[in-house]
Structures are given as C-alpha cells and as structure tokens.
C-alpha cells in the first residue's frame, strides 16, 4: 500500500510534538486531520500543513468527550472517506505528590491521556477493520517505565497507554491493524528551554547521549510506525530517550 495519499488523524496536534508528527506525515504525502482542543491554533497548523501539498483539516476535539470524538470521526468519514492512521498524542500534566494530589487532577489526566486514547482507538478500529488496514500509534512516556516524583497521575496514564496498545495489537492483528507506542524521554520544548542552565545540565547527566531529544526525534519514530514499511511490527514500545531508559 502506498503511504502517499493516506489519511491520518493526529490528536493534540496544534503545537509541539503533535505538530511535528503532523508535519512529518505530510512530508510523506499523507493527508492530515489536525484535532486539538485549541481550534484557533489547530487552524494555523492545518494551514501550514496544507502548504506542504496535502489535504488538511482542523477540528476542535476534547478527546475525553465521547460525543466530540464520535463527531470528529464522522467528519473524517464524510470528508475523506477513510482513515489509515491514528496518532493518539493528546495529553496533559497536572503534577503533584501523591498525598497532595487532588482527585480532580487525577481524573482529568486519566480522562484525557488514557480515556481519550481509548475513545479514539475504538472509533478508528471501526473504520480500519472494514478496510483491513490501519496504523495506531500511541504516545506513551519514559515516566511509564521509570516513574517520576510528582507525576503519579501522568505515570499511571502513560502506563495504561502501554497496556491499551498491546491489547489492541492482539485483538486486531488479523484485520491488518497494527498498534504501537512511542515513549519519549526528555524532549526539548518551550518548558525545558525555560529551565535554568544548571538544572538542564543535571537532567542531561541522566541521558547517555548527553542531550535532550527534539520533537522531530519523536516524530520520525511515529512516522515510521505509521508507514506501510512497519507492517510486521505491532504491540511494541519504541523508546526515544537517548538511552535514559533501556
């Protein structure tokens, strides 16, 4: 199957890692739906993606809302007629130590990071199973494997992503659908850029490659797992962390 001309939905793709993933797919000729809770930013990103010579559409999406998720997939079916790739990238953090964490902060992170991936995957599989082809790539985190103080909700949500991924892989391999996860480590973002230099240097000491990752380091892994070339890879977690976790 040709990669060029396929249709991808990338959640949380108005900026950051999600935007880089969308751009990476578009550079391969994939049509991309930009879905994000921030529609204004999504529209800007979609315009940039369309400038790469592919079709692109921006949709508002709160992934924790089953109604909004269903509406987005109906829109994709109506406007594109198919869906080949789903990247569950939408996610948030609400940090706090276990004893200080509010229940609503636990629920919010689980609902967006894990329930959102569940809802989107469920709708995607309905389409992909009929096509007998599909690629689902979920964004996990090194925190799912190493833990991180102050992120009990985030770590639990990303560990759940790994279990979700492996189960989907087993359930739908016979339908030509693969499901894999990418687990980023410390990635250079506006937040990490703002850290004091001494803090950044301490963080780098935990990374054998002695640098932070870039959004394109993550995007490149996602693009490969989204491609027809990855057809014999399913149920796997690809770690993109410079050797911080092995």
Predicted regions and their residues:
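Active-site helix of classical SDR
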Residues: 121, 157, 165
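Alpha-helical segment proximal to the catalytic Tyr-Lys
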Residues: 126, 170-174, 231
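Residue(s) in the substrate-gating loop at a strand-loop-helix junction
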Residues: 141
